[in-house]
Design a protein with these regions (language model features):
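Alpha-helical "hinge/linker" immediately C-terminal to small N-terminal DNA-binding modules
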Residues: 1-31
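C-terminal effector-binding regulatory domain of bacterial HTH transcription factors
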Residues: 10, 59-63, 187-196, 205-242
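Short loop or secondary-structure boundary microenvironments that flank
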Residues: 12, 43, 162, 217-220
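All-alpha effector-binding/dimerization core of bacterial HTH-type transcriptional repressors
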Residues: 32-37, 41-43, 48-56, 107, ...
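Central regulatory/effector-binding core of bacterial HTH transcription factors
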Residues: 35-97
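Short, well-ordered beta-strand segments
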Residues: 36-40, 85, 134, 183, ...
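Residue-level signal for inorganic ion chemistry
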Residues: 39, 199, 230
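C-terminal regulatory
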Residues: 79-81, 91-213, 240-242
Length: 242
């Protein structure tokens, strides 16, 4: 594309977006929600919250397509063409509109009984330095995530090391289930495995609580029908939705 063509496209894109939104509003008035809803989020959110929402949306709005881009990297959702994003509140820009998607949750340390039988069970945070901790590489910076824990009622950041590095919390959970090492995961993801006894919760007094996941989107004069449909279904589907 020539430079002139790129300038022309940049100039008409807002108008085209307005036309698409007007068409979507017209069909919504007829009781149909259509179009493509693009959401950027973390893979962990898909497993924590989005699956039941998507299942309900498919039944209620069969002409609405939802594209989920699961990525560790925090992107500019407007520049990248997303309708909305889902992240921890602290990662969201202040000029965005936010709506709570999940309740608060704890980030916990888990390991399998096989691993603990072979390596022992840590009793203190300092003991983690002697264990195989499954690392998480952050997408945007490439840095290794430092575990956020509570030590004697004060927040601490712990650097860990181990034989495995992943780019996704679900991968860390899978490795913990396989007996590879200790993983730092959201408690809702591990709940079933804790109940079954496949995993054990380590150092429970050190678990950090996060404020939950929030849907966010740019401020507009009015909310697009497809995004409104998503929010309405989320409210009815998730018990923790506020």
């Amino acid at each position: 594309m020539t430079e002139a063509g790129a300038r022309f496209l940049a100039g008409v894109e807002p108008a085209l977006a307005d036309i698409h939104e007007a068409i979507e509003r017209l069909t919504a008035e007829r009781g149909e929600v259509t179009g493509l809803l693009r959401i950027n989020t973390l893979r962990v959110v898909l497993d924590m919250a989005l699956i039941p929402i998507l299942a309900t949306l498919a039944g209620q709005h069969p002409r609405l397509t939802v594209e989920i881009n699961a990525d560790q990297t925090l992107v500019d959702i407007v520049a990248q063409g997303f309708d909305a994003g889902i992240r921890l509140r602290r990662a969201i820009r202040q000029d965005m509109v936010t709506t709570r998607l999940t309740g608060s949750f704890k980030a916990i340390l888990v390991a399998s009984r096989d691993y603990l039988d072979a390596r022992g069970t840590p009793k203190l945070i300092a003991d983690l330095q002697q264990h195989n901790c499954i690392g998480l590489r952050l997408g945007e910076s490439g840095a290794i995530f430092e575990w956020e824990l509570i030590d004697r009622k004060k927040p601490v950041v712990v650097k860990t090391s181990g034989t495995a590095l992943v780019t996704d919390t679900m991968q860390a959970l899978s490795l913990a289930l396989a007996g590879v090492g200790i993983a730092y995961v959201a408690e809702p993801l591990a709940r079933r495995y804790l109940r079954e006894g496949s995993l054990e919760w380590l150092l429970p007094q050190s678990a950090t609580e996060y404020d939950g996941m929030f849907l966010y989107y740019p401020k507009r004069a009015s909310l697009a029908p497809k995004l409104r449909a998503f929010i309405d279904v989320a409210k009815k589907t998730l018990k923790s939705f506020e």
